[in-house]
């Protein structure tokens, strides 16, 4: 049954994307937004990334580090020190908290563990369900989330918020940042609204998610845009399959904030304003798993097979 769910999920993604695939190299001149099955699509032209590249490199290294099986508290990754780790990276995705000189207290979640069935099943539980208002009371009316991701976040949420508040006080730190790869990127996305509601001090400095799948519907994407205050970014590398899944045709929608590295693993990156920008990753039809676990801002994020400990800007 477990294998069937995974196979069905991947088959649906492939079929729907083949049927509705956008043509390569969109050049249409149109208003900034138009409707796609009632959802927003941006035609805004790309811009330079809004922050210094070293900031994204530090985020990328911390997104990689939470995937490492061998680690110890107080390990250094760039300008950050590991403070806390939780989860078995099977039923519970590994969460790690760092103190970074440039980013504040950083929460990083590991990506899906392909060697553990519960991690795979959580990622395959793809149905959209209503947001749990106990955690997300400020989400827009009608907001829905990917069931497997919401369930995974709810398991870690009480511990996460408690430890986050503790380390903010311990380090007298007002900045909070969120990151992760893949499954972990989805949890960083979901955490944003819950963290903002529960902060006792400070604010969310940045959220930078790598290889982010679509996590919710249009109303969830709108909620991220509203509450992120322009500080949420997700990075797509080349033809990464995961960033294109689940398909929009199933009701899913990315929020604003895409940075697209194209070609993959290169130093050519641009910021694509608005939701589901046609000039960004959606403009090319292709599926690549190697691009998912690739090089982001000259920093490898390769899950179990990447640098451990993670390195910053050396790839």
UniProtKB/Swiss-Prot annotation:
GO MF, one annotated term: hydrolase activity
Subcellular location: Secreted
Domain of life according to the entry: Eukaryota
E.C. numbers: 3.1.1.-
Chief location: secreted
Keyword Cell membrane recorded: no
Glycan-linked positions: 74, 265
Signal peptide range: 1-21
UniProt-listed GO biological process terms: lipid catabolic process
GO cellular component: extracellular region
Keyword field: Disulfide bond, Glycoprotein, Hydrolase, Lipid degradation, Lipid metabolism, Metal-binding, Secreted, Signal
Top-rank EC class of the record's enzyme: hydrolase
Catalytic function, reaction form: a monoacylglycerol + H2O = glycerol + a fatty acid + H(+); a diacylglycerol + H2O = a monoacylglycerol + a fatty acid + H(+)
Residue pairs linked by disulfide bridges in the UniProt entry: 68-308
UniProt-annotated catalytic positions: 182 (nucleophile), 240, 292
PANTHER family according to UniProt: ALPHA/BETA-HYDROLASES SUPERFAMILY PROTEIN, FUNGAL LIPASE-LIKE DOMAIN-CONTAINING PROTEIN
Known function: Secreted lipase involved in Dandruff and seborrheic dermatitis (D/SD) probably via lipase-mediated breakdown of sebaceous lipids and release of irritating free fatty acids. Shows activity against monoglyceride and diglyceride substrates and generates free oleic acid from the substrates mono- and diolein. Able to cleave the oleic acid from both the 1 and the 2 position of the glycerol backbone as 1,2 isomers of diolein were converted into oleic acid and glycerol.
Family membership: Belongs to the AB hydrolase superfamily. Lipase family. Class 3 subfamily.
Name under which the protein is recorded: Secreted mono- and diacylglycerol lipase LIP2
Source organism: Malassezia restricta (strain ATCC 96810 / NBRC 103918 / CBS 7877) (Seborrheic dermatitis infection agent)
Lineage: Eukaryota, Fungi, Dikarya, Basidiomycota, Ustilaginomycotina
